[in-house]
Structures are given as C-alpha cells and as structure tokens.
Amino acid sequence: SSSTVSGSKTSTYYRSDGIKAFSLTVYGTFSYDGKEAKILKAGTDSNISKISTKTLDTTTGHGIYASWVLKVNYAGDLKGDYRVLEDIPEGMELGYIRIKWHGNKAQSVVSKTMDGLGDDWKQYSNTATNDNGRSQNTTYYYNKTTNKALIKLGEFENKHTRDECSIDVQVVCRVTDSKVLLGGQSKTFANKVTLQSNDGEEHLATSSSTAALEKNSLDKSHPETFNGQTIKYTITANTLSQKLPSNDGNKLTLVDKLGDNLELDITSIEAKDDAGNSVQIEKAFNPETNTLEISIPNEKKIIITYTVTVNIAPDISTKVSNKVYWKSYGNDGGKNDVIPDFSYNLIAGGSTTTTDNPHLTIKKIDQDNANPMSGVTFDIYECKLNGDKIQRVEGGTTSGETENGLYAVQAPFVTYYNTIYEVKERNTPDGYMKDDSSYYIICVDKKNSDDYADDVKQCIAYFDKQSNKKYKVAYSSTDFNLTIYNSQKGILVKKAFINNAMGTSHKPVSGTYTFGLYDNPQGSGSPLQVKTITYSTGETEEKYTKFINLNPKITYYVFELDDEGRPITNTSQEVTVNKLPYVVDYKVKGNSTSKAVVVGDEVIVTNSLRTKKLPSAGSRLTLIYRQLGLAMVGASCTVLLIIYKNRVKKIKEEEIGK
C-alpha cells in the first residue's frame, strides 16, 4: 500500500485592499485504525502527535485522512471577527476542525457560535491540547448535505507583526471515495477555503491546497512452508476497520479469484475479527470460474483463512497465483499473491500406498451459500480408458446418499488405485438447477516403482487434456475426493438498456444498478434482499444477479431502486437512476403480463430513455429533438416575415420617392 501527497502548496492571498489574509497548506496524509495513527506521506509536518485521534473517535473514526492547516492573519493586519468557509473535497467527509496554534499576540483569538445558518448546519465542538500546550476548545459547523463547513474566528488584533498575530486551524478530512477505498485508485483531493466577513456577506479571499491518497484495504498472504500439496491462505479485509462503502447491494463483498490449478476446500473457510472471535460471513463459490465471494461485516478488520490443493503432479515446479479484490471494482484494488515455483514431494520411495483400497469421498455443496447439501444420491461407476473414450465396467457400480453434505463410498463396493471412477448425481433437490454432468476421478500410484505404469500414464495424459474441471487426478489417497456443487434456481435479474428513440442502441451505461426483492406488488416495506449490477466504462456484456435462499412456494416481486433507494413500481413515470432520467420496465421471461415471480423465473429490467412517437413520421424521436425542430421552424418563419415586411416597406418608399 502507498500514499502520496502531490500538488501541495502554501500560497499567501490578499484582500482587495492589500491586506495579507491567509494561506492553506497540506500537513500530510495518515491512516487511523482506532489504535494508532500512522503517517502515510508527510507534508509540511511529520509529527503524528499533531493529530487528535480522540476527536476522530467521536466523529468519523477509522480510515485514511488528509490534514490541512489554515493560517489566518499572517501579517497581523486583521481585526475583529471573521468567518472561514470550508469546501470539503469531493470524495471526503469532515473529520474535525480545531484551533491548533496561537501566535504570541493572538492568545485571545477564539472560535464563536453562529445563529441562523439553517437546519442543515449542525454544531460540533471539541477540546484538545494545542501546540502551545494548553487545552483548546473549538466550535464549528458542518453541513453534510452540501459538504461544507464553517468556523467563526474572533478577537483578532491588528498588531502588524508577522506571524505573531496569526493562528493555525487544522482541518482533517476522511476519504469516502469508493474508487480509492475499494478500487485501489489514487485520487487528488482539492481543498478550498474562503475568508468571509463577520456576517458572511463579503468574500475576502480564497486559498486552496491538494493532496493525493492511495491505500489498499485488502491483503493476502501464504505461509513460507507448505504442507505437502496444500496451501493455507490468509486474507485480511478492511485492514483499518473503517466504514467502507457497500459494494454488493447493502453488503460489503470481496472476490477471491483462485488460479486454475487450485482446488478450494470450501469447508475449511474460517473468519475471525482482530480479537480472534469467529465472525459470521456469507460465502458463494462459482466452480466454473474458480471464484469465491465472501460478504463480511463492515467497520471490522476480518481475517479469513482457507486451504487449497494444488492440482499438479509431485516433484515438478509451477507458478501459483491467487488474487483478492473488492467486488465491482476489478483487479486493481486488490492483492495478487504469487508463488513463483511451488512444488511438493510424496513420501520416500515414490508411493503413497497404505492399503490396496483408497477411500473415495464426495462432498455436495450449495454453490450460492456454501452450505452442505444432504439427501443427494450419487451413482458411482468403475470405468476404464478405451482409446480416447472412458467406458463403464460391467457390474462395477454402487450408489449412496449424502449426509451433512458428505458421501463416503463404503464396502461392499471397493475402490482401487489406478482405476477410473465416474460420479453422477441421480436426483436434483427442489429449487436447484439439474446437474447431468459426469465427474471422473482416478487415484494414481507408482506401486513402489520409479514411475507410473504405461496405462496409468495414458489416463493421466487423457485427464490433463480435458479443459474442464470434471476430470481429476489424485496423486495421493488424501486427495481422493470430489466436491460437486449445485446452483440454486433463485430469481435471476438481467439488466437491459434502450438508449435511443429508435430502440436500436442497447449499450450498457456505466454505473451501479440496485434491485430489491419484495413480497408485495406495491414494493412497500423494506426489501427482503438487495442486489446490484455494476458496469464499468466500456463493458458491453450482459450481466445478471440472482436472489437466493428463497421459498419455492412464495410469490415475489422485483423492483429496481432509484437514486433515493425507493422501489420503481410505476413503469410509465420518469425516474432518476445513476443521475440519469429513465423509464424502467419489467418483463418476466416467458410471461409478458405478470410482474409476479417465483423461484426459477428470470426478470429483465430495462432502463429506457423517455421518448415519444411522431405518428406522421411513423418513427420514434426524442421529445427534446422534436421541440427543438418546431422552435427552429417557428424562428425561421418569423425571420422570413420580417425580411418580407422590410422589403415591401422599402419598395413603397422607393415608389414614393419617384
């Protein structure tokens, strides 16, 4: 992680009558995790003790910050009371304002209360030790709606001595920009202050200063030594325990992209807080993309651990990579953990044989919530490789049912080394997508030899050529297992767009679109679940989200939420989504009339620019273009009429002149 201060400046500004007014400078950037503040990049001061962390504990709490200092009355020419208006940088919120230092002849300068500012302005006060070593009380006002702050400073004396009649005011702001906190981007924040008269009517001077911040809130690591074929990874999420923006509906979700040669043990996932207490999390895993999603509590440092198996043969070296990042913010804001040359060894002699019968186990997992699934029946077939085809061996079959997500193949059916087994799901639980796939696994062994037998080598080569994850070579008996996932049907939501009057442009518009699931057609009450779909600039593919853990016997309703978080139930009314005017339409796939949905349905939510149809033209034109065209025609007619009248008048005058 890194932080930078760029573009910082100390500029002195003057009033119109030549009085030297004030200047703003960046003192530095820092992080605060509730225990200690750490300088990220020093500006004009690297002393972290100048940060009032006790004040932050009562306002914005943990996070990454920039600290600015405003020097008022440097030349000592100001007299009386003045206001300072603070424009908080976009993507930040005010942490606090405090009087930090008094010049020798400015000991009587204080902050004062103000009346009549309006309901949006809230008064704040803090007490901290200033740089003069005395307890200092500061009162200021903050308008969260406009993200502006005000402080009134009084009792200045114009002694006309440089810096002795001045005071320093510290302004500390916390980063709230999601692209910085979740996306890992660097952003320059511009702070602007305005010196005003006592009543705020006259703006006397302005000053500005900038600071750039960049700080990763995710980390990932692996141990220096490995336990055979497995690796235990550690993810540290929200390293500062700060309040981060939600990025998955009303949730905070991270994405962990496992390398293609890694097999996740989903039952090994554990999450704890910084004190070592277990934390409730939500998990989902996509076996097709080898991607894990974990939703975590906000405002907590969460430490997640899990193990993976590296699916490679022993005694060879390979690169292993595993990347974590925040959902909807791409790979840039995460941490890519790379092991450049992972390898492992089997026991001496090149054999893992303990008995003639390795024990095959099957795990059945709900991929949408990572819960074990019971009552699923699997058929197991003994097979052999015949040329380039796997064929079942007559009579070599058994079946069994999962309990707590696990089925262990037992006697009288016996499994052997160097033998292919086909695993196939027989029954699909209610509410889940049917899986007709066959999964193949072989546990290979050298049988106390220096190398595998030729037929075993052929099986390994055949499995390695397959491009999907339904073929597994287990190089040890401890790895002789399969994890098979089922996806819930749920209720699928697809996002669509109509961007022009002709209805021919369907390119996604960048932004985050939010959807709520309700149990009533009015969209009243709080949504049962909230999901989001995010498009970045340039993305064109169709995107979906899915509501899960639903009752198949209940009817539901899906509504997009507007910028105020309200369900859009009126499909003829223009609404604001992502600060753009749209008409939102809902269509249940296969049912063009009903808005009611049940488990297994797909809802297409279309955002359309509002258009009107011109019957005379038989085509669709945007209303604004139509009105503009009519206005242009009217203006042209008026101009032509004026020209005609002037011409007639001129002709008559010429005739009279003759």
Region spans (language model):
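Solvent-exposed loop/turn and edge beta-strand elements of beta-rich ligand-binding domains
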Residues: 1-658
